[in-house]
Amino acid sequence: MRRLHPEPVPQLYEPTLESVRRHPLPDWYQNAKLGIFVHWGLYSVPGWAASRKDPYSIIAERGFDAYFRENPYAEWYLNSLKFDDGPTRAYHDRNFGKHFAYEDFQPMFESAAQKWVPDDWAQLFQKTGAGYAVLTAKHTDGYLLWPSQVANLARPGYRSSRDLVGEFVAAARARGLRAGLYYSGGMDWLLNPQRIDTPEKIYSTILDGPKYVEYADAHWRELIDRYRPSVMWGDIMYPAGANTLELFSYYYNRVPDGVINDRFATRFTPPQRPGLQPPAIHYDFLTPEYTSFDEIQAQKWETCRGIGSSFGYNRDDDEDSYLSAGAVIRMLIDIVSKNGNLLLNVGPRADGSIHELQRKCLLGLGAWLDVNGEAIRGTRPWSHAASTTLAGVPVRFTRKENTLYAMLLDTPGEAEIRIRNLHAAGGSEVRLLGIDERLKWRQSGSDLIVRLPAPLPDSPAHALRISVGT
């Protein structure tokens, strides 16, 4: 295997647990709060999944057998094809023919992707108010979105000749976004084609052995050397036998302000809670998937999820299966109040175009952040995340220096609201973001009473800025 040989770099970190744990969480990641995830690959050509329900609903209602057979994740199309009596196989045979192999999507994808204009994405993500974006450089199907010098062990030409990764990174940075890369380290269905139909098989099919360890490591080092990603977003563990501390120190020495997620475990241990993967020995942030936390977490975390129930493009998604901008806004507020980020996914079509309903959601989120972004970006959790008004409107808190933000997750029905368990110091100034007007307020015991402007703006959530008196 050929490897790139970059110029020597300062060795700030050694391949030891003690050394990599000294890596600080960079301010840019803590401050950004919102990232955009992009799942794009061969699975974008069929662009289909059998279910439009979120994974936890399917599992709760019908169990894991139904979940794997009718997987809502369109990016798992190849695994879903392996159920001979399943809906994906029926869809595939009807539309492409029973002798059409998954790998035959490669020329179709590469032809369609020629229409992709990278700045279209970057401009949209910038308008959304995101601080970073993460692209799937290699998903579980093993196909590479960059012209790697490290060929697939089973199918050497299984990679894009156009440098989709490089163009994505350059376009994102040109628009002021950080660029991160996703890589499925433990799973590659071209190298291990065993069907996954139980949770146990997710982990029993993880690849290992010296050849695959060298292969995955070489890919990551190539991605680091070429693109200097701000986020190393691994998935579904990492091959047993790999020295992840060497990989992490290699990365930190080249990208000192980069971050690494929690999905690089090289041996199975039970996840800390549903929605998390087995914990790695080191990480900068946790990654609950399609779920969240109930309380403020000391450890930085990032929820990842699609606007719909899939990460990859599902052509059957519609307004009923996509989240509205309002739902995403309220989700973001809740996550940020508990020390989290939101990595919100879009699934482009094979030609790079993004569904109009996904675009509508992103632009609605961006419009809200244009007015209320100061209550989100650059903030930290307060002493507690949540309260309510006397009338039951949910409230979430963030803080920034001498300013507290109280965000109402609905529009109150009364002109005067009473926020429970919130005390403002004498001389504090209360304003509603987006309106240049000081609001009248008074303290009543442990509650803060605020008279709102009339009429209130039409908005999914309203942010009060409480500038603490000094």
Where are these regions (language model features)?
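Mature catalytic domains of secreted/periplasmic carbohydrate-active enzymes
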Residues: 1-470
